[in-house]
From Swiss-Prot:
It holds the Pfam family 7tm_1. Residues 1-18, 74-91, 155-188, 244-260 are extracellular. This is G-protein coupled receptor homolog FPV021. It is a multi-pass membrane protein. Its main location: host cell. InterPro entries: ATII_rcpt (IPR000248), Formyl_rcpt-rel (IPR000826), GPCR_Rhodpsn (IPR000276), GPCR_Rhodpsn_7TM (IPR017452). The chain crosses the membrane at residues 19-39, 53-73, 92-112, 134-154, 189-209, 223-243, 261-281. SUPFAM superfamilies: Family A G protein-coupled receptor-like (SSF81321). Keywords: Disulfide bond, G-protein coupled receptor, Glycoprotein, Host cell membrane, Host membrane, Membrane, Receptor, Transducer, Transmembrane, Transmembrane helix.
Length: 320
């Protein structure tokens, strides 16, 4: 199974390709302007805060997902022919995987940040400063790039299987590179799914079940939707990823060929989900009397945090 944006197989049925193209179109049409809007407001229009810095970098990472979707759409429409050459193939691989890692890292850090704001104010008072957050963000980007480098290195425009050109990962030149492939896949599975899933579920479940009294309706809906969307959109891809790691003799190859491209398209769809969650929850659940721009600001900026903290203090006084 290939794990990159240029990996849809020609064996896919017409219905399968139609579904994949539909998901790609939705992901790009919604995800690109949506994430650019978040980047514009959090990066240029609003006052910088810890919260806006997190969401700014999350939007940048998600944009790296969607920016190469038109190339993938072209690839499918041309009958699974890759016309863009080796350089674009490898750069696209680097951007896709870097965006994937960085997006998950930032979602995980946002979960930890929400948890600390609710339960560990001592940690927030000691460490939650913009300079510390910026250091964590820079380290996250560096790690994301390093973890993505093997995918770019082994990317190749391959023509040996048919009279056509593909953008594929070529780990099969010898046993050493095949072993490296498994090591890279195992690290990837742990770093971009298992650990983040455990951390996010832990943080958000505690927020929902132990701190729900101090969460607004909009915050509660946002948390539930973010957890659900992450698990629904990322789990199929990582299940296939795990099956691929343990070896081809454990699964039916035809099933993987049919399911893999669809699972990859769901990963692209995830990049467009986050800004829609913020906008829809803010507009229709939590801030009905505000404009879309004001609702987005209240969800993605510190102002909402400060307002919520003040409300929490009042609730605590009433309880006591």
């Amino acid at each position: 199974m290939d794990t990159d944006y240029g990996t849809v197989h020609t064996q896919q049925s017409v219905k399968g390709n139609t579904l994949i193209l539909l998901i790609y179109f939705i992901s790009f049409i919604v995800g690109f302007p949506g994430n650019c809007t978040v980047i514009w407001f959090t990066g240029y229009r609003w006052k910088k805060s810890v919260t806006t810095i997190w969401f700014l970098n999350l939007a940048i990472a998600d944009t790296l997902f969607v920016i190469f979707i038109p190339f993938e759409i072209t690839y499918i429409l041309m009958g699974h022919y890759w016309p863009f050459g080796l350089f674009v193939c490898r750069i696209g691989s680097l951007m896709f995987n870097t965006g994937m890692y960085a997006s998950i890292f930032f979602l995980t850090f946002i979960s930890i940040d929400r948890y600390c704001l609710a339960f560990r104010r001592d940690i927030c008072n000691k460490y939650r400063y913009r300079i510390n957050i910026m250091v964590m963000i820079i380290i996250s980007w560096i790690i994301s790039i390093l973890l993505s480098t093997p995918y770019m290195y082994f990317k190749n425009t391959n023509e040996k299987y048919r009279n056509n050109r593909d953008c594929l990962e070529d780990y099969h030149s010898d046993n050493n590179t095949y072993l490296l492939r498994r090591v890279v896949f195992c690290i990837s599975l742990v770093m971009r799914y298992l650990v983040p899933s455990v951390v996010m579920l832990f943080c958000y479940c505690l927020l929902l079940f132990k701190h729900s009294l101090f969460l607004s309706k909009g915050q509660t809906y946002t948390i539930v939707i973010m957890i659900t969307s992450f698990m629904v959109l990322w789990t199929p891809y990582n299940i296939l990823y795990f099956i691929d790691v343990i070896g081809s003799h454990y699964y039916n190859a035809d099933t993987i060929i049919d399911a893999a491209p669809i699972s990859i398209s769901l990963i692209f769809l995830s990049s467009s989900i986050n800004p829609m969650i913020y906008m829809l929850v803010g507009r229709y659940v939590s801030f009905e009397n505000y404009s879309m721009r004001e609702s987005l600001k209240l969800i993605l900026s510190e102002e909402r945090d400060n307002q919520t903290n003040h409300e929490n203090e009042i609730k605590m006084e009433n309880i006591n």
